[in-house]
């Protein structure tokens, strides 16, 4: 799941939230450190404007609250010469994986699609970045997952597959395939074709636009990791806006009482406060 702007609180939610479906316990398996969520919560555009050191401070707050794996949204990964240090730093902090996208130049959010210029790296260039990152690791545990932007850039599934095969050969530990198509059919086509070539390489998807598809169906396509990338921030922001607007309208807080959790509950939310 995505990281909330209140990072430690998000860690607590993901660590502790669970439901029972019949006799089956459902929980979140890990956390996604989203660069969109990270930058938006700081009032910055999603263009890699928030540096690694700042993002690591937030990650440390999450790591105080959770033992679950964290996947770091690495955007483009930056210059190869800088990426090797990013890998070592994340590895040292206990982050489980980084996902980097095969784009170059100023980062623009993928969900803009072809409304903005989306420039893909060459296959050779991105393979070199993957190889350099893998060579810089101290342990074998850290994962570098290659995010393919072909479908975002308006290219066919065949281009995405060509890149995926090359990136795995270069050492990528997994493949993330992204699309803003609402049907999910292009994702399905990619996953089924990729699985014929590689039976065990993890596939990651982010069903923000094709959110009608159940996890079970995605798994049938061969998907291993499903990231709900920004939903908690998108839920929190309208709620906060509504409270602020209602207070302005009524010049008191009574009307927002039913929108807020009781003071007693917030005081007792974090162990050790009382």
Where would I find each of the regions flagged by the language model?
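Catalytic cores of alpha/beta
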Residues: 10-16, 78-91, 209-223
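Glycine-rich phosphate-binding active-site loops on the catalytic face of alpha/beta enzymes
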Residues: 30-40, 92-108, 170-179, 224-239
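Active-site cofactor/substrate anionic-group-binding motifs, chiefly glycine-
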Residues: 13-72
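Glycine-enriched alpha-helix->loop->beta-strand junction motifs that scaffold or abut catalytic
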Residues: 17-30, 95-96, 138, 166-174, ...
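Active-site-adjacent beta->alpha loops and helix N-cap segments on the catalytic face
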Residues: 46-59, 80-84, 102-138, 179-197, ...
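Short, small-residue-biased leader/transition segments that mark boundaries at the very start
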Residues: 2-4
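Conserved, mostly hydrophobic/aromatic
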Residues: 7, 73, 94, 133, ...
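Extended, intrinsically disordered, low-complexity segments
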Residues: 9, 231-274
């Amino acid at each position: 799941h995505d990281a909330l702007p209140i990072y430690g609180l998000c860690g607590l939610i993901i660590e502790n939230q669970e439901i029972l479906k019949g006799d089956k316990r459902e929980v979140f398996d890990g956390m996604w450190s989203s660069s969109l969520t990270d930058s938006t919560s700081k009032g910055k555009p999603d263009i890699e404007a928030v540096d690694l050191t700042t993002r690591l401070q937030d990650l440390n707050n999450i790591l105080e609250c959770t033992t679950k794996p964290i996947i770091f949204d690495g955007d483009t990964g930056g210059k190869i010469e800088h990426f090797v240090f990013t890998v070592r730093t994340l590895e040292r902090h206990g982050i489980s994986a980084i996902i980097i996208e095969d784009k170059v130049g100023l980062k623009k959010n993928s969900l803009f699609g072809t409304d903005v210029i989306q420039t893909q790296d060459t296959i050779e260039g991105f393979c070199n970045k993957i190889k350099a990152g893998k060579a810089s690791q101290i342990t074998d545990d850290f994962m570098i997952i290659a995010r393919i932007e072909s479908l975002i850039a308006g290219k066919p599934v065949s281009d995405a597959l060509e890149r995926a095969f090359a990136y795995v050969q270069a050492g990528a530990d997994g493949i993330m395939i992204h699309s803003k198509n609402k049907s999910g059919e292009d994702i399905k086509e990619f996953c089924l074709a990729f699985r014929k070539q590689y039976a065990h390489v993890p596939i990651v998807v982010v069903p923000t636009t094709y959110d009608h598809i159940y996890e079970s169906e995605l798994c049938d396509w061969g998907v291993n990791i499903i990231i709900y990338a920004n939903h908690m921030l998108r839920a929190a922001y309208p709620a906060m806006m509504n409270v602020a607007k209602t207070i302005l309208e009524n010049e008191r807080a009574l009307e927002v009482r039913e929108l807020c959790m009781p003071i007693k509950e917030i005081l007792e939310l974090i162990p050790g406060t009382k």
